[in-house]
């Protein structure tokens, strides 16, 4: 799920800058033989965007940096495990919108949130550890997200 608000500067058609805020959240549940994962992420970030407006079309690029909250409540060999990785992250996105009416439009967007775990906390079997990857930024500590969304927009 996601939500965003953008304020466009100026009133000329063509290319316009925008400022706003982005929220994006996700939930994943998975099971294997001895493990059950319940992962939730929440991302909040101020945004800067460039919009190319042409008649009823709006093509845009967005970027921002914010904070990603990551929580994993799992069961491993019938014992609870909690992982917390709350980190700074950055996002990039491209999208487009077709304006059906004055206040309504349909849109699609591809977004990427770039985040690495770095050091994080694991609580398992009544003990807590701080974990630090041996090889940072080689992919094993990647908690990034790629998403595609489509929807109906209302313009105030």
Language-model features and meaning:
Residues 1:
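Conserved alpha-helical elements of sugar-nucleotide-dependent glycosyltransferases
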Residues 4-90, 98-104, 143-156:
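Gram-negative (and chloroplast) outer-membrane scaffold detector with strong preference
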Residues 92, 100-156:
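Predominantly the C-terminal beta-signal and adjacent terminal strand-loop region
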